Amino acid sequence: MKYPKLVFDVSFDERARFEAKSRGYLSNVYVQQSDGSMYPVVFYDCIRLAQDLEYEVSTGRMCVADIGMIILPEVTLECIKIAVKKLTDEGYFKRVVPRGD
């Protein structure tokens, strides 16, 4: 099996891929490393992140914070795979806490 591996809580079929790209957001995803450790990740594109921040500011919260937030130019499977591979190669996942079961 090739690592890092993407693990989706729900099927990431053609429709889900279209919806993620359209929304600019994807959650309920984990990155599994070769040692079996799983890291929760959330993907945003810049437009969706700006919209969410604008909303949060309007409510007085003043921030957007998600564990494992990764910002992409667009939320596509191709961009997700490239980003996760690069982050793994750079040691990103060694510096964050894996999901506890």
Task: Give the residues covered by each predicted segment.
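Short helix/strand-capping turn motifs
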Residues: M1-R95
